[in-house]
Each structure stands twice: as structure tokens, then as C-alpha cells.
Amino acid sequence: MIPYVLGIDSGGTKYLVRAAALDGTILGEFRGNTCSHYYLGKEKAARETLNNLGNCLARFGGRPQECLRIVCGSTGYDSPEDGALITNIYENLPGFDCPVYCVNDVELAHYIATGGVGVLALAGTGSIAFGRNKNGKEVRVGGWFKSIMGDEGSGRYIDAKALHHYSRWLDGCRPSSPLLKEIERVVGSPTRKALMDYSLHMASPPWPAANLGEMVDRAALEGDRYATQILHDAAACNFDLVQETIQLLHMEQEQNLCVGIWGSVLMNSAVQREEFKRLLLTHYPQTTISIPKKDAAQGAVDIALRWYREGGSCWKILRNRK
């Protein structure tokens, strides 16, 4: 018998589950496809979730009945109805009979980056800001679907901006540049039909991972002014989300304002990250910027272990309340 806990990062394009023994030793992990109920529907999301967990347990011969806690940070947890649906999936996994705590992935990241008080900017496949002040008030800004101009500053946003730039080149409005050559290689051929086919693929759920950001980064580092403009625009969008969160929480005058950075787009793009930092420190020079060294799945594992050892409420742990 190997008692263990599970920490899960259920994102929009990937699913990462990690198992740990009660002393914190990592027993196994598995990376699978998204289990978002928005993309798959509840029944398929439940099947894929069980499949992902089963693959993780197979790494170390774990059995469902030996699991003592599950903590999951999930995309698509955008309302009480979403929360009830996602929690229901985990509470009804065949063979598992342990306490479960599901939360929006940005709240999990917020705890990892700030310890429970401060503001988090998350820019990965999508984007959102989340904050909590010392009085316990919570605010989230952004995180809406792209069809209502949401996810500004995210990987999807950068993809759309890059393809828009490419479309203007096809129209004859833009000169050739390193970025356009990179995009042409991905699209396949410099034709309207190829661009329409590629954009249709990107717009059809389950949406593929945002994948043009690295090209935009490389082009910006080579001096492509349009690529730099796209990344600076994305940084400004993410700063706006954070600033609105700060203002809603009345944290403008906080002497020790902590702002965490999370997500592949902000973490991996030096050009966007540095512009975001510049904007943030220009407006709020008292800010301490936190860039966590652990990923969301490990953060979920750590919380699950603490929850098991201390008992009580996982909700309170995430908010640093006794």
C-alpha cells in the first residue's frame, strides 16, 4: 500500500497530474490533453480525467483507494455552476474515495506566487488577473472568452495579432520581415486560402495550443518592429488587468505590494515580461515582483499534503486563514 496525494494542473491545452507520497517524494506524473468541460462536455471530460489519473497511477503502481487528497486547479472554473460541475467529476471518479478540492487555476497560481495576499497576472493560453487584499476581499479581472474580446495579452491574443499582421502583408500593406517569414513557414504557403484554413483550424475547439508566440519573440529579438509592437501591446493588456485589480482592491498605496507573474507567455517571453515589469514599476514602484520556481501541479501537491497533515479546510489554507 502506498498512500499518496494528487496535485493537478488542468489547463486549456494540457493536463498535468502529479502524485506524491506523504513525505513529499514524487511518485509519478502524467501529462495529457485538456479535460475542459467547455471543450469536451461533462461526460468526455470525466472520461479523460479518469484516463489521465490512471496513467499517472500506472507510473508507480498506485491504486485509487490509496489516494488521500486531490487538489485541482482548473481552467473553466468561472462560476459556481462550473465549480459544482468540475467538483462533481472528481468526487465521482470510480475507485477514489478521498476529500477533493477544486479551484480556478488562477487562484491556485495566486497562492503559489503570493502566499495568499497580492495580485497575480496570468498569461498563458488565456489571460486573467486575480487579487486578494489583507482584508480578504477577492477580485478577478479578465479571463473571458476570445469571442467577447477576452484573453487579452495571452498566447491566443498574440497568435491572432501575428496572423492579423500576416493578413496585412498578404494585402500588400506590410513589408517583408523575419516574423512574416516564420509565419509563412507555419501557414504553409503565402496565399489567402492557406491563411483561412490555418485560422479556421485555430478557431475550432478543442483549440490547439497557442504556438506563434515563440516566433514573435524570436523576431522581436532580431529587431522586427512589428513583433516588438505585438509583445509590448500584450504586456500593456496584462498590465491593465493587474492595474484594474489593484484599484478594485484599493491596494494602490500598499507599501509592500506583491504582484506574481504566471503562465508561459509572461514567464517565457523576455520582451513582454520586461515591458510588463517596466509598466508595473513605473506606476507602482513599491511593487515586489514574484516569479515562482514551482509549477502549478507541484503547488497543488504541496497544498494537498498540508491539507492532509493539518486537516480543516483547504479553502482556508489558500487564504492563509486559521
Where on the chain are the PLM-derived regions?
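A short glycine/serine-rich beta->alpha loop
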Residues: 37-38, 76, 143-152, 286-291
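Short beta-strand-loop/turn "lid" adjacent to the catalytic site in phosphate-handling enzymes
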Residues: 54-94, 101, 111-114, 258
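Glycine-rich beta-strand-to-loop/alpha-helix junction loops that act as flexible
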Residues: 71-77, 123-125, 257-267
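Acidic, glycine-rich active-site loops and adjacent beta-strand->loop/helix elements
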Residues: 74-78, 105-108, 126, 145
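Glycine/charged-rich beta-loop-alpha catalytic/anionic-binding loops adjacent to active sites
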Residues: 91-94, 137-146, 279-288
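Glycine-rich phosphate-binding loop of actin/hexokinase-like ATP-binding domains
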Residues: 116-173
